[in-house]
Swiss-Prot record:
ATP binds at G10, P11, S12, G13, S14, G15, K16, D17. This is Ribose 1,5-bisphosphate phosphokinase PhnN. It comes from the Bacteria. It is an enzyme of class 2 (transferase). The keyword Repeat does not apply. NCBIfam families: phosphon_PhnN (TIGR02322), PRK10078.1 (NF007485). One of its GO terms (molecular function) is ATP binding. Its EC number is 2.7.4.23. Belongs to the ribose 1,5-bisphosphokinase family. Keywords: ATP-binding, Nucleotide-binding, Transferase. InterPro entries: GK/Ca_channel_bsu, P-loop_NTPase, PhnN. It comes from Enterobacter lignolyticus (strain SCF1). SMART domains: GuKc. GO terms for biological process: 5-phosphoribose 1-diphosphate biosynthetic process; organic phosphonate metabolic process.
Amino acid sequence: MTGKLIWLVGPSGSGKDSLLEALRKQEHPQMLVAHRYITRPAGAGCENHVALSEHEFFTRAAQHLFALSWHANNLYYGVGMEIDLWLHAGLDVVVNGSRAHLPQAKARYGESLLPVCLQVSPDILRQRLEQRGRENALEIAQRLERAARYTPQQCVMLNNDGSLLQSVEMFLHLIRTHGNHKESQHACL
């Protein structure tokens, strides 16, 4: 493979969907943002995804149409085999990944994988979760606890406390400069 698979992870509320949407709006001829296939209705949440029923999802999985797939938060997620074609064509591909399933991505893509972890301070994360209004107070507390205890190893860290424009610029800078370094890297704004 000649392209990089950028596996973007981070806690709920860290700004992954906003970052991906901003990347889609810019012109990057050598980079594509992959859509995930999710067993969630099209209008639910903020993510631009392909909505599938569980039956459709399992039919595609049985036909080996997903490069990667996982189950989380009572939903099934998949990334289509098309990403392998894009990578072989030399394109970099950004995927809204899963922190817990980073080992699965590493096993499949090896040195072609660039894991990037969005991090935000606890106060900013709490504020964002409260503003979006999808979780109650208990669910917010659980998400904050999960975010504090789980940080993937060997990821390039990107602080997302600043503006969306700053985060997009730093994300693109990380992709250009860090490549597939094995050691953990940190980028702060």
